[in-house]
Amino acid sequence: MEQLFNDLQQQIAKEMGSTLSLIDEDCGQLEALAGGEDRYPVTFPCVLIGIPETLWDNLASNLQHGKTTVTVRLAFDCYDDTHYGSTQEQHAAERMALSRRLNGCLHGWRFEGCATVLVRRASRQFSLPGGIKIYETEYATTVAEEIQNSES
């Protein structure tokens, strides 16, 4: 699983590194920031990666396949006035284009240790207090893991 996380970070950095300020594991930084905490500082735009669930099936005594969910959150601090006629309307479109570009570098990619390519399953947009806009995409893949049992 750690290889998948590292590979995701590297792929995003390779394809989009110059446009992002931070690529990190999602540890609730945005929710903490929205709650007034600065314990997990973030800079924007950022991508936060989570692997919230894997459902495992046994293939052999020490080999399992897992159906894995990956969440990728692209976040911006939005201080632009993007209402129609503001002359800054393009900023909203630029954020959406960056989200599409992020999906383009992940969807269909086969990462090391994965039995299937990463496939986009769902996406949504939402805002948090403080002018934070989040473009969240959920992906699915299948990973293989060999269990290393320690014998006594």
What function would you assign to each model-found segment?
Residues 1-62, 115, 150-152:
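Small/polar-rich, solvent-exposed N-terminal microdomains that initiate assembly or binding
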Residues 18-23, 30, 42-48, 91-147:
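Acidic-leaning, charged glycine-interspersed low-complexity segments
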Residues 52-53, 57-82:
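Active-site-adjacent structural patch at catalytic or cofactor/ligand-binding sites
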Residues 77-84, 101-107:
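Short C-terminal domain-edge/linker segments immediately following a structured domain
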Residues 82-94:
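Short histidine-centered catalytic/ligand-binding loop motif
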Residues 83-86, 148-152:
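Short, charged, solvent-exposed linker or helix-capping segments at domain edges/interfaces
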